[in-house]
A protein has these predicted regions:
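Residue-level structural signal for beta-strand termini and adjacent loop
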Residues: 59, 235-237, 277
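Short solvent-exposed loop/turn micro-motifs enriched in small/polar/acidic residues
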Residues: 38-40, 60, 215-217, 256-258
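A short, contiguous, amphipathic alpha-helix enriched in charged residues
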Residues: 234, 238-257
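Active-site phosphate-binding and catalytic loops of NTP-dependent enzymes
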Residues: 27-33, 254-261
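Cysteine/selenocysteine-centered motifs that mediate thiol-based redox chemistry or coordinate metal-sulfur cofactors
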Residues: 257-277
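Alpha-helical recognition segments enriched in aromatics with Gly/Pro capping
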Residues: 1-86
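Helix-rich, typically C-terminal accessory recognition domains appended to large enzymatic cores
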Residues: 17, 34, 66-235, 265-270
Length: 277
């Protein structure tokens, strides 16, 4: 059987009907040993313009030529993925192209500005890198391509902010980011692959795997309350016991602590509530 069939719902009374009929007939006469022609079926939606399916007869077709000329084919490709869930119809809007175009330029600039810095790996950057691998991989596997693109934007912003804070990005993170974006912006991916000093095609590279250890939380945020009202938030080591967390919370409150403490409540990993008079 075919691993994946991608087609619009309009094929249900044509290709799919014929394919299933022939497959079941061949199975019945013992020629094949499977009864369905496709392991997985994905019906994509249609791109619409002015509320109607794009059609030459309706005169609402958008030619990609000018868009490719002005923004590049990677921007057009990524915007098509970003416009909405692939299984639903989506309304085309040329203005949305600008945001994707700006993102690709920011991404390119980020890699180029950091490729020669030889900055060492940090735990914080390693965590962001692995979070990005996890999100992009999971969303790609489930065909959630619109959230893949939004995920690139969100994670790139986080990595950019951290790079400014710590002074650079390590080479492995740059390599990983380039590999991740390549299926969605192949021309930029290939160019950046060469610019960071890699040989051959980026599409011969191995897809990165998540390091689960890098994703483990080392700190937790605790909400500190007095008589049920939020007064502060603290970040503490995840290994701290109840008494240590309460002690840290009381230290944070300082002179705001009640004179007479009646009770100290700790909800593990979430809240410290000091009850007093």
């Amino acid at each position: 059987p075919v691993d994946m069939y991608v087609g619009g719902v309009e094929h249900a009374v044509l290709h799919l009907l014929y394919a299933r009929f022939y497959t079941k007939f061949l199975y019945d006469i013992g020629v094949i040993d499977f009864v369905e022609p496709f392991k997985k079926l994905f019906n994509q939606g249609m791109i619409c313009k002015d509320g109607a399916k794009m059609s030459k007869s309706k005169g609402n077709v958008v030619s990609p030529d000018e868009l490719v000329r002005d923004y590049g084919c990677d921007s057009v490709r990524m915007y098509e993925l970003f416009v909405g869930p692939p299984e639903l119809d989506a309304e085309w809007n040329d203005r949305g192209m600008e945001g994707v175009y700006k993102f690709i330029n920011r991404f390119y600039k980020l890699i180029m500005e950091n490729k020669d810095k030889n900055y060492g790996k940090t735990a914080e950057m390693d965590k962001l890198k692995n979070k990005m691998i996890q999100e992009i991989t999971e969303r790609t596997d489930t065909f959630s391509f619109n959230t893949v693109i939004s995920g690139f934007m969100e994670n790139t912003n986080k990595i950019t902010d951290l790079a400014k804070k710590q002074g650079g990005i390590d080479k492995d993170t740059l390599k990983t980011m380039t590999i991740l974006i390549a299926p969605f912006a192949p021309h930029i991916g290939e160019e950046l692959w060469a610019m960071i000093g890699k040989e051959g095609s980026i599409f011969e590279a191995t897809w990165p795997e998540v390091d689960e250890n890098a994703l483990k939380e080392t700190t937790m945020e605790i909400v500190v309350q007095i008589n049920g009202k939020v007064k502060a938030k603290i970040n503490v080591d995840v290994t701290l016991d109840k008494d240590s967390v309460i002690s840290a919370a009381k230290e944070e409150l300082g002179d705001r602590l009640p004179e007479n403490i009646v009770k100290e409540i700790y909800v593990p990993g979430k809240i410290v509530n000091i009850v007093g008079k």
